[in-house]
Amino acid sequence: MTTPASVDDVRRRNLATLLRLLHVHGATSRADLTALTGLNRSTVKTLTEDLVVARLARETAPVGRGGTGRPSITVEPESERVFVVALDVGVAHLTALRIGLGGVVLDRRDLEQGTGDYAVRRTLGRVVRLVRALLDGAPPGSRCVGIGVGVCGVVSDDDGVVRFAPNLGWVDVPLRALLADRLDTTLPITLGNDGDLGARAEHLRGVARGLTDVVYIAGEVGIGGGVIAGGRPMRGTGGYAGEIGHMVIDPKGRVCRCGRRGCWETAISEEAVLLATGAPAGTPLADVLTAYSTGEGWPRAGMRRVGRALGTGVANLVNVFNPQLIVFGGTIRHVFAVTEPIVRESLVGVLAASAEQVQLVVAGLGNDSVAVGAAELGFAALLDDPLGTMQGLPLVARTGA
């Protein structure tokens, strides 16, 4: 026999529903919150007052009448007071954002990583410095409710271990525990794969908002991806779905860092572009793409090969997932932008119905897709139990958290 929910359980669930709506939609009238939740007006009024007292939301009195009846009070999330630190740990870069409730980017720190300089201790030191800089810049009296981390590798959700990140050279790195120790914090730290988080961010706040079936492709040194199916992230057994960069498209191709031969990554990554075009090692990708798009001859043949390889992988993804949208993020969006006609030619061989339905677009959040997705990991505990999570969290002081 199922035990009926207690009054406290119902209240906690309703507060979570209300705060999640504010987090996703931003400023919303009480009348609209009533309609969206299906709760009565007095319940919504009480719940919003609870969120205001907890300093999770604020209410704004209506300026004037927009129609008949009494204008409804507007409720919005306290973006400046409640925030997370979101990290994108890439191969060539580190990005740290302070993101307020409601998805507002409040502050950022970016750092380029030197080629091959990915030792765990050194990378961890850089990440810790970025996090502390963001916390030091937070206004006094605000609260950090969590830290979300996107990593370009296979991540175990349960224990926060980076199982395999070939482009960083990491194997079984307990990143969550290491970060908690170095930051000396009890804040929840949650890790996720960069491709999964990029897909989540574009679905929640980017070009895929409102759609149900989306494939996100991103990369720089490596290629990753994430899939939204039926409006939900596709996790797979163990949460390792979406490693599309290691889809084999040429069994006789180059050896990948993962040890296999002919992975998609070996044909379309930044390194692959330089090799295909004959550009000297270390040449900025932007220089190669500019030369190609302006009609210079030297990169033409190589870029066409890259475009065909990109198109082959895209065609495979369309056939397998039948998405409404394929989103190109990271630096691969720039490769797609200059090879789009070649990529689209590859869709000729795709099942007609799938090819007609899919759209190919670049990421709406640009380079921030992964970090914005990581922020959602940081907010997860708060959105599940708003008042319980806020209890005991320290206020940010002038010199840090």
Q: Which residues make up each language-model segment?
A:
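Short, acidic, Ser/Thr-enriched surface-loop or helix-capping motifs
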Residues: 100, 157, 228
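Glycine-rich phosphate-binding loop and adjoining helix at the ATP-binding site
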Residues: 105-108, 112-148, 153-215, 337-349
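ATP-binding/phosphotransfer module of carbohydrate and carboxylate kinases, centering on a glycine-rich
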Residues: 1-112, 116-143, 184, 252, ...
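Short glycine-rich anion-binding loops that position phosphate/pyrophosphate groups of nucleotides
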Residues: 63, 152-155, 220-222, 332-333
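Short loop/turn motifs at secondary-structure junctions and domain boundaries
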Residues: 76, 87-90, 208-209, 216-219
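AAA+ ATPase active-site-proximal loops
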Residues: 195-196, 223, 328
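Glycine-rich phosphate-binding loop of actin/hexokinase-like ATP-binding domains
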Residues: 211-267
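Short helix-capping/turn signature of helix-turn-helix
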Residues: 24-25, 205, 220
